Amino acid sequence: MAATGQNLAVVVHRAGDLRLENRPIPEPGPNEVLLRMHSVGICGSDVHYWQHGRIGDFVVKDPMVLGHEASGTVIKVGAGVTHLKPGDRVAIEPGVPRETDEFCKTGRYNLSPTIFFCATPPDDGNLCRYYKHSASYCYKLPDSVTFEEGALIEPLSVGIHACKRAGVTLGSRVFVSGSGPIGLVNVIIAKMMGAAAVVVTDLSASRLQTAKELGADFTIQIKNETPQEVAAKVESLLGCMPEITVECTGVQACIQASIYATRSGGTLVLVGLGPEMVTVPIVNAAVREVDIRGIFRYCNTWPVAISLLASKRINIKPLVTHRFPLEKALEAFETTKRGEGVKIMLKCDPTDQNP
């Protein structure tokens, strides 16, 4: 198999400046593979880099290819690659450690400060026709798992990591704050891990309906309630305060509601990223021994996710609501910015636009 044609890529130059450009087709190193990209999802972080040119300390200083929720086909392997061959369909884990530091040695490579991560400045992403990546972080997809499911393993991994950090187990009562793509994958995984009841909050009625379809037991459409009122509604629906809360919005009022809602001795996991400084009722959490935990991306999740998808124990296909060919990427980004649908997928292979 050979790379042919142009390497069309979606490139952000600075805040508000998003372009479709042709990039050189890369040559894989000894431990890398060259991929013909198939499906790449648009993440909120991609839109944020486009709109603002930065996320926290990660600043777009040079043109950067976006995209990190991805799958594709191997078309060339480096000399040292033995477990993959041309023609293999793979899902891409976007974070690749650059060194074996203390975090890698303890299995928490996501915390390595020098990690390569697709579409995080200055590292290019994979929203393009052809892309090279570390072979060790490309995972072969079973025939029963589609390319789109392979791309969705990235957001699904956030749910796996968050629910593991939260300690979801058989019989857990769980509150998920926010029903965007990340809130929805947390619903899926919480139920998969044995949660007895899951309640979800959001502003959008349509997204809450999707949450119900994916397994949520109860939903609350937020209007103008105070954080304490939201917490009271959560308790009323569950019949008790939840032992576990997964906050997926990053909005100050939602974090406040999450603290008030969580049962004494319970766990709150902060997944959504908002302003660097927020005002929260920390004393309320402290005196009730509510453990507040963060997560940063994920680690050791791709094999688990592939096994779950191959076994058909979970269904993430309903997350994809819109599809665009790569040539219409700018239209796809505008659609995402307007908040339409749930997950928008870009199809990068002009010869195969199937899921």
Curated annotation (Swiss-Prot):
Similarity-based family: Belongs to the zinc-containing alcohol dehydrogenase family.
Tissue: Expressed in liver.
Role this protein plays: Polyol dehydrogenase that catalyzes the reversible NAD(+)-dependent oxidation of various sugar alcohols. Is active with D-sorbitol (D-glucitol) as substrate, leading to the C2-oxidized product D-fructose. Is a key enzyme in the polyol pathway that interconverts glucose and fructose via sorbitol, which constitutes an important alternate route for glucose metabolism.
Keyword NAD: yes
EC number(s) on file: 1.1.1.-
Annotated NAD(+) binding sites: I182, D202, R207, V271, G272, L273, I295, F296, R297
Chief place of localization: mitochondrion
A GO CC term assigned to this protein in UniProt: protein-containing complex
Domain of life: Eukaryota
Organism this protein belongs to: Gallus gallus (Chicken)
Lineage: Eukaryota, Metazoa, Chordata, Craniata, Vertebrata
Membrane-protein topology: Peripheral membrane protein
PROSITE patterns: ADH_ZINC
GO molecular-function terms, A-Z: L-iditol 2-dehydrogenase (NAD+) activity; NAD binding; zinc ion binding
Chain residues that bind substrate: Y49, E154, R297, Y298
Reactions listed under catalytic activity: keto-D-fructose + NADH + H(+) = D-sorbitol + NAD(+)
Record-given protein name: Sorbitol dehydrogenase
Needed co-factor(s): Zn(2+)
Cofactor note: Binds 1 zinc ion per subunit.
Chain sites annotated for binding Zn(2+): C43, H68, E69
Cellular compartment(s): Mitochondrion membrane; Cell projection, Cilium, Flagellum
GO biological process, one term: fructose biosynthetic process
Pfam families: ADH_N, ADH_zinc_N
Modified residues (N-acetylalanine): A2
Keywords from the UniProt entry: Acetylation, Cell projection, Cilium, Flagellum, Membrane, Metal-binding, Mitochondrion, NAD, Oxidoreductase, Zinc
PANTHER family: SORBITOL DEHYDROGENASE (PTHR43161:SF9)
